[in-house]
Amino acid sequence: MSGPDAQTKMQFLFALRSRGVTEAAVLEAMEAVDRGLFLRGIFSERAYEDVPLPIACGQTISQPSVVGLMTQALQVNPRDTVLEVGTGSGYQAAILAKLARRVYTVDRHGRLVREARQVFQQMSLSNITSLVGDGSHGMPDQAPFDRIIVTAAAEDPPGPLLAQLKVGGIMVVPVGQSDAVQTLIRVRKTENGLEYDELRPVRFVPLLEGLGKDT
């Protein structure tokens, strides 16, 4: 599939700005990553609509404005090491890879990880490490992380992930019941404890333990 034309890209960036994605580095990263590469079949034609779309394993690719707002809230620096819990399509990880030194991404569905890895290779993104695993426990062998982003909803910010966050680090996670509107939370880890900011209402699939049946 060819990438978006100039008009489509301009409309896409305008829509992101109008929904609060205003940081230049985030917009540049999202402009550089073709969302269509992460979608299959008829859904690739809707890649530049600001809507969530279905992918394999009963999962979804989040709407671009939510991806942008979560990325913006994470405040990624060029030297950061980032953990993403929930690879999904790989779209979020690819954007993070444009901003961070190293991205580790984990998903419980082997098929999703394999398909995302193919796109990362196609895009020559050599700073992403993708693994199949139970993301609710993080990646302790690679910890600690400067930034952690969770793309599934937990009832509370997961303790194992907070333990893997560096002092001075930031975690962005949807918090709430899986069958209701959740709240996007930003957690800052300081020497004195944890600071929480409520950002906006969101809807995400639940964060589940264990591996997917397809793995």
From Swiss-Prot:
The active site is at S62. Keywords: Cytoplasm, Methyltransferase, S-adenosyl-L-methionine, Transferase. It comes from the Bacteria. Catalyzes the methyl esterification of L-isoaspartyl residues in peptides and proteins that result from spontaneous decomposition of normal L-aspartyl and L-asparaginyl residues. It plays a role in the repair and/or degradation of damaged proteins. This is Protein-L-isoaspartate O-methyltransferase. Pfam families: PCMT. It comes from Ruegeria sp. (strain TM1040). GO terms for molecular function: protein-L-isoaspartate (D-aspartate) O-methyltransferase activity. It catalyses: [protein]-L-isoaspartate + S-adenosyl-L-methionine = [protein]-L-isoaspartate alpha-methyl ester + S-adenosyl-L-homocysteine. It is found in: Cytoplasm. Belongs to the methyltransferase superfamily. L-isoaspartyl/D-aspartyl protein methyltransferase family. One of its GO terms (biological process) is protein modification process. InterPro entries: PCMT, SAM-dependent_MTases_sf. The gene is pcm. One of its GO terms (cellular component) is cytoplasm. Its EC number is 2.1.1.77.
